[in-house]
Every structure is written in C-alpha cells, then in structure tokens.
Swiss-Prot record:
One of its GO terms (biological process) is glucan biosynthetic process. It comes from Shigella boydii serotype 18 (strain CDC 3083-94 / BS512). The chain crosses the membrane at residues 1-21, 26-46, 77-97, 108-128. It catalyses: a phosphatidylglycerol + a membrane-derived-oligosaccharide D-glucose = a 1,2-diacyl-sn-glycerol + a membrane-derived-oligosaccharide 6-(glycerophospho)-D-glucose. This is Phosphoglycerol transferase I.
Length: 763
C-alpha cells in the first residue's frame, strides 16, 4: 500500500509542478532534487532486493559506504551499468518534464504543493522507511527487555550419550524442497528430510542472513551484530568472548569438536569464531590440500562438496571408532551464488527449469545428492544409533539464477533432524527462526532448551511466536547485542606485535591492517576484508574532523604524508584528522608501543579535499620516485605512463594475469634509451618455467627463460625506433586459484615479477 501511495504522490508532484508551477530556478532545483531522491531511493531498493532478497538491510548499508568486492561481482557489472544509465535517463527526462511550462509565470502555491507532495512521496516510500529504521538501529541505546529474553544455558550437558553431525548447506533453503514448485529437484535429501523431524517454518531475521551470521545465530542464539561489518570478523582475535555457545557446552561436556569446509577458514573469521567457542579441530582449504586425493580439484571458493563430504565421512569413521564423544560440523559451498558449482562425481549435473538449463538449480540438485550420500553412509554404519544428524541452511539463497523463482514461494530456511537413537518422523509447522537451531539441538542432546535468544522448538516458545514484529524487535536489540562484545570505548595507548601482525589496545586485539575512528565515547574498528574497500578508501569517507588511527603497510600512506617510505612494505602508523594534522610513524621494533595524539587544530578544507582525492587514487594510477619498477607495492615509477596484464601486488611481487591481458605491457612516458640493459628479477609459474618467453621493445625481441624460483636476468636491447613500450609474452598462462582472493574467478598466471629496471648503456 505504501508503494502505491508514494508513487501516487510522486506522480502528482510531477504533474502539478510541470503544468501549474511555472518558471522559478530555486523551486525547480528543490523539486527536482527531492523527486530525484525518490528515484534514487527506489532504485537502491530495487538493486538491494536484487542482491539480498530482503530489501535494504545491514549488509546494504555497509556496502553503500564501502565497496562490494568478492565472489561473482563481475556477474553484476552489466546490471550496474544499466542502473547508472537508467538513472541518468530518468533524471534527464524528469528535468525536461518539470520544465515543460518554464515560460509561464511562477506560482508560489502550486510550487509549494508540488514540493510538499514530493517530500511526502519520499517519506511514504518503503526504501526511505527501511533506511530510517537501519539508521535508528545504529544509534539506539537498546531495548530494556533484552535481559529478560536473553538466557545463558548451563555450561554442560549432564551425562551426554549422543554424537552430533551438523551439516550446513550453503544457501540450501527449504524452498528448494517444494516438489510442486521444483519437481524432482531434491529427491535424495528430500526423502531423508521426510524421515526425520522437519521444521517447516524457520524464518530469517536481521543479522542472520549470510554464512558467518547464520553460524553465529544457530550456535549462539544471537544475530551477528558487531561494532564492525560482519564479514570483516577475520580481523578480530576473539568472537563474542563473553557468550556461551553450543560449541562451548559440547567441549565442557567432553566432546571433541570438529569443523570441516572446503573454503579458507579465515574468510569472515570462521576460524576465530570457532576457536573462541570450543572447536579445537578445524579443516579448511589450507588444511585439506595436503590430504585430499586431488588438491587441484577446486572451484572459486575452495574444494568441491564431494571432496569435503568425503573427508567428513573419513573423520566420522575415525572418531566413531575411537569411542570419543564428538561433534562434527561441516559446511558445503557448491550452492553459493550467483551460479553455484557442479561436483564431478554427482549424477544430477543438470536441472532444467522453464524449458532451459539453470545453473543454480543444477548446483542444488548435485549438492543435495552429495549430502544425502554422506548421510546414508552414516545411517548404514554401526555408529548411527549413537548419532544425531542435523541438516540446515546457513541462510536463505542470495541473488542467484534461481532467485526469481524462489521469490514466488513462501521462503524458509532448512532445518531437520535425523535421530539414530530414536527415529522420529514428523513435520513441525511451529514458527521459529535460525537462532532456535542451537537450542533445539542442545535439548535433543540432553541439555537446556534455551540458548541466548534461541528456544528449543520441541519444548520452548520461539521469539518468532512471542513477537509478531520479530524483525523490528531484533533490530531494537542490536545495541544490546553489540555490547556483548565488551568492546572498548577509548583508545589512548596501543601495542603492535609484528610477529603476530596484531594491534592491542584497552584489552582488545585485532589483526592488521586496521583503521580506527576514535571519538570521546567510542572506538570504531574498520578492518579490511574480502568484501570491504581498501582501508584508504574507507578513510576517504571520514569527516574532516574525525580522529583516525591507521595501521597499514607504509607505502599505502606514503603518497600522502611520508614520500620517503613509498617503497617500504613495513608497518606504519598514521593518525590525525584528514582536515587537520597527520603524522606517520614507522614501526621499527618487533613490539612497538604507541599513543594516540589528536590535536584540536583548525580544519583546512582544501587540505581535506586534497587528502581525500589522493586516498581515492586507484592502485594502477599511483606513481612513486624510483629507478626501477618495484612490483610488491602499488603503482609504478613516475616514468611509467600506464601498464596492463599485471595482477595486484603481493608480499613478494606481482603475477602476470592473462585474464587482464594476454601480454604484460609497460608503456613509458618517454622513448626508452637507444641502447639499454633490461634487468628483470622474476620467476615462472607452472609450465612457463624453462620455456622461452618473448620480450619485445619496438621491432627487437629477446628471449627470457625463467625457473620456478626467483632469478635475475639481464637482456641487451637496441632501440633505434625510439619505442616507448616493453612487452613480455608468457607462453602458457595457467588458470589457477593459487594465491587468489577467496571467491574470485581464477587468474591465469604466467610470470611472477619482482623488479624490472632499465639501465642506459654507453654509446
């Protein structure tokens, strides 16, 4: 209803101003601005819903102030360009319509009415209301009834008898199991679901809508609200340190807790969360690569589901034979948006919908087959009678190629339980949410029937039943949940540990690099993660007078305030205000002590603008003073005009990447010397080793041969044509995820460059 009202007000404002208001520059600008805001809000809502399926939520608010990088982002470049072009066209058309009768005399009454209607359209729009609610949730003090509903369970289970296998299916929501909507999509796992306790109405709440958030909700009974963006949790040293979670209770009760997944454990801080709450045995892509049958059989995120579940089965056998009480948690990945991945061992490799193949549905059908095979192995084993198997989605599916079909259904998360000790076959339609999962499992294992805000769906009453407005209630509790982190409110002294790459202050520890906004009553950490903008881009969003402490590699801040450190990859500390004074200190000791020192200076807006503009320079446009191209820092020497075919800086240098260009091209601002030596320090990747690598300058070509280890080679060039471009052609770029950012498409690596130097020869 509010959508129709807001659109009607918008339309009325446009028509009244266009036909009655007449000509007045101020009223035209004001009305166009407000109507334009209405358009931007609704496009933001549309785009947000495209990604989240839940409108403008916490994840979107974070993205609006940072940048979205990570898995599958390239899939959305064209839609993003389309939105920008559409927005430009709408603004142009709106301006033309409003100026329709610009030659008529101005009418104050109609102008005021049009502006009020425009303001009303913004106020009535769902997008404005969602953003308003989110902003309020950032500044509330909390809800006084939080303490009444948040309950800590007993720290142990008396006389535990059952082992636990808990399977998180990535985005594997219950909606996929609707056989009428999606015939024969999940036959194997669907049959197992129907044999157990199937909870059919598990809703998704704010703060539970991505993987680490879903894990926290299901194991701790609280949403993941933090004083920083949730996926940046890899930077913290402990995770809700004061809370009692399911893993803590299991460990205290004599369980050995295991977690197995195909992706890197550091992503989104899963390793920190699990280690903080009772898990001593963790296996991710790094830990599995030395034990799996084929370490090269991987997708963009890590190992495929068939590999991961095979390792989980081996671990289940080993632990069951030992007689030790255990829990085994595993997380799949093949159903990750936007398209998913197909394991090579499954029979269900293709699923057609609407008369054509659908990659996301195909990935679901394949993954559920692998999960079902794993469960059936357990059921066929002699240890099943002592085992409880739980299958749940970590969250609802995000925007994938099946998403528009899912949205036509009543969407719920998956949660079902198969008991080996006491088979039960029942579908329970009780209203519940992800936070109830841990309490329900705890109840089955013989513990309490509550865990944080979660309640057992077998013997308790879910918050989803108690509160009809549970989503709004959850947001109202957000400040209370953030306070559970016990995060410090001041920062006066800090310590940097170079061996551990950590910073400590006021009892808290964070991994480096780190940016902090420091005020009188609050310290806001802004870590760097796969889904966040680089810290310098985040700093560029600070207000002129915001106090900051920025700990990062020296070269990243050198172009602003310490040019002498432009080639240093050591740690540096910068602090101050973007519109005031800044200092840069080189961290020159293994354990380095620092103090915050913010001076109350006059703000210089010209200085502020200059700092912001410099911070926003993209890596490839950065230039530094040097007589050679140093590849382990961002940018290039001042003599270089542009370059291509080169990947991002790493600690040792940079790889060539054929995804960015078949050749490495370095174009200089001026012609290269008539005679020069080209000194190349580099290595080769894979099959490029010991192969001739053409190196060209103008019409002259030399051959470079590299091994897998770094070596230095000098090539002699004559340049009679005054060529200004150096070209290196790796013979056989190899597609690989080695050293890649988690979730990104594979790079095609050829040579790894450490340094390239042009040395002019006499004569």
């Amino acid at each position: 209803m509010s959508e129709l009202l807001s659109f009607a007000l918008f339309l009325a404002s446009v028509l009244i101003y266009a036909w009655k208001a007449g000509r007045n520059t101020w009223w035209f600008a004001a009305t166009l601005t407000v109507l334009g805001l209405f358009v931007v809000l609704n496009i933001t809502l549309f785009a947000s819903d495209y990604f989240t399926g839940d409108g403008i939520n916490d994840a979107v608010l974070y993205t609006l102030t940072n940048s979205l990088t990570g898995a599958g982002v390239s899939k959305y470049i064209l839609p993003g360009i389309g939105i920008v072009l559409g927005l430009t066209a709408v603004f142009g058309a709106l301006g033309w319509i409003l100026r329709h009768r610009r030659h008529h005399p101005h009418h104050f009454g109609y102008s005021l009415l049009a502006l009020l209607l425009a303001l009303g359209s913004v106020d009535a729009s769902p997008a404005f209301r969602q953003i308003t609610e989110l902003v309020k949730s950032q500044s509330r003090d909390g809800d006084p009834d939080f303490a009444a509903y948040y309950k800590e369970p007993s720290k142990t289970i008396p006389d535990p008898k059952l082992n636990l296998v808990y399977i998180y299916g990535e985005s594997l929501e219950r909606t996929y199991f609707d056989n009428e909507a999606f015939p024969d999509l999940t036959p194997e796992l669907g049959a197992l679901k129907n044999e157990g306790l199937d909870f059919s109405h598990t809703q998704q709440l704010p703060g539970t809508d991505y993987t680490i958030a879903g894990m926290v909700a299901s194991q701790c009974g609280i949403p993941l609200f933090a004083p920083f963006e949730g996926n940046a949790s890899a930077s913290v040293s402990s995770f809700f340190p004061q809370n009692i979670c399911l893993g803590d209770i299991l460990k205290n009760s004599g369980y050995q807790n295991y977690f197995v997944q195909g992706a890197n454990l550091r992503f989104a801080g899963k390793d920190v969360f699990l280690k903080s709450h009772g898990f001593d045995h963790l296996y991710g892509s790094e830990e599995l690569k030395s034990v799996v049958a084929d370490p090269h059989y991987r997708n963009d995120w890590g190992f495929y589901d068939d590999t991961v579940l095979d390792e989980a089965w081996k671990k289940f056998e080993e632990l069951s034979r030992s007689g030790q009480r255990f829990s085994l948690f595993t997380l799949t990945v093949d159903t990750h948006h936007p398209d998913g991945f197909i394991s090579r061992t499954c029979n269900r490799k293709k699923y057609d919908f609407d008369g054509k193949p659908n990659q996301s549905f195909s990935a679901v059908s394949c993954s559920q087959e692998n999960i079902a095979a794993f469960i059936n192995k357990i059921k066929a084993s002699p240890w099943f009678k002592d085992t409880v198997i739980v299958v749940s989605s970590d969250h609802l599916a995000m925007n994938n190629t099946a998403w528009k079909y899912l949205n036509k259904q009543d969407r719920n998360n998956l949660f079902f339980v198969i008991r080996g000790d006491k088979p039960q076959q029942e579908t329970l339609a009780v209203k519940r949410n992800t936070m109830d999962n841990g309490a329900t499992v705890l109840d089955i294992l013989g513990g309490d029937n509550y865990l944080g805000l979660g309640r057992s769906s077998l013997s308790g009453q879910s918050m989803s039943e108690i509160f009809l407005n549970i989503k709004e209630k959850t947001l109202a509790w957000k400040p209370d949940i953030i306070r559970l982190w016990k995060f410090p409110k001041e920062m006066k002294e800090f310590t940097i540990d170079q061996q551990k790459n950590m910073i400590a202050f006021s009892g808290s520890h964070f991994r480096l690099p780190l940016l902090l906004r420091v005020s009188d009553k609050r310290v806001e950490p802004l870590p760097e993660s796969e889904y966040s903008a680089p810290l310098r881009f985040q700093l560029a969003d600070f207000a002129p007078r915001d106090n900051f402490v920025w700990v990062d590699r020296c070269y990243k801040m050198a172009q602003l305030w310490a040019p002498e450190l432009a080639l240093s990859t050591d740690w540096c500390v910068s602090q101050g205000q973007l519109g005031g004074q800044q200092i840069v200190q080189h961290v020159d000791k293994t354990t380095w002590q620092g103090k915050t020192a913010f001076k109350d200076t006059v703000i210089d807006m010209a200085r502020y603008k200059g700092n912001v503009d410099t911070l926003k320079i993209v890596d490839n446009d950065i230039r530094y003073k040097a007589d050679s191209f140093i590849f382990n820092v961002a940018g290039a020497p001042e003599e270089v005009k542009q370059f291509s075919g080169i990947s991002r800086p790493e600690s040792w240098g940079r790889w060539s990447n054929a995804q960015l260009g078949d050749e490495v091209k370095i174009e200089y601002k001026h012609p290269l010397p008539k005679k020069f030596d080209l000194v190349i320090t580099a290595k080769a990747y894979g099959n490029n080793a010991s192969r001739p690598i053409p190196v060209r300058v103008g019409n002259e070509e030399q051959t470079l041969v590299l091994g897998n280890e770094v070596t230095t080679t000098t090539l002699h060039f004559d340049n009679p044509t005054d060529a200004d471009t150096l070209v290196i052609v790796p013979p056989e770029p190899v597609s690989t995820n080695e050293g890649n950012i988690l979730g990104h498409s594979p790079r095609k690596l050829g040579i790894g460059m450490v340094e390239i130097k042009v040395v002019e020869r006499e004569g």
